[in-house]
Swiss-Prot record:
GO terms for cellular component: extracellular region. Transmembrane segments: none annotated. It comes from Myrmecia banksi. InterPro entries: Pilosulin. This is M-myrmeciitoxin-Mb3a. The lineage of its organism: Eukaryota, Metazoa, Ecdysozoa, Arthropoda, Hexapoda. It is found in: Secreted. Expressed by the venom gland and reservoir. Keywords: Disulfide bond, Secreted, Signal.
Length: 91
């Protein structure tokens, strides 16, 4: 009698293990996917910041070229005022 109870208990444990194993697999797979998604977001944000910094550098270069052109034309006072305004904007 005890042997049949033991085998019945083992059968129930085996069935429960089989039934619940897909849930455990899903939980095990969810963590790496979430980490990969988080890393992808981090890289995407890093790329966006790098592009924004490149755009700022390009704007500064364009402004410098404009100021050089203004100075060449002989508008030194205007160039000095523009430099002050631009410095205040970048601070």
């Amino acid at each position: 009698m005890k042997l049949s109870c033991l085998s019945l208990a083992l059968a129930i444990i085996l069935i429960l293990a089989i039934v619940h194993s897909p849930n455990m697999e899903v939980k095990a797979l969810a963590d790496p996917e979430a980490d990969a998604f988080g890393e992808a977001n981090a890289f995407g944000e890093a790329d966006a910041f790098a592009e924004a910094n490149a755009d700022v550098k390009g704007m500064k270069k364009a402004i410098k070229e404009i100021l050089d052109c203004v100075i060449e034309k002989g508008y030194d006072k205007l160039a000095a005022k523009l430099k002050k305004v631009i410095q205040q904007l970048w601070e």
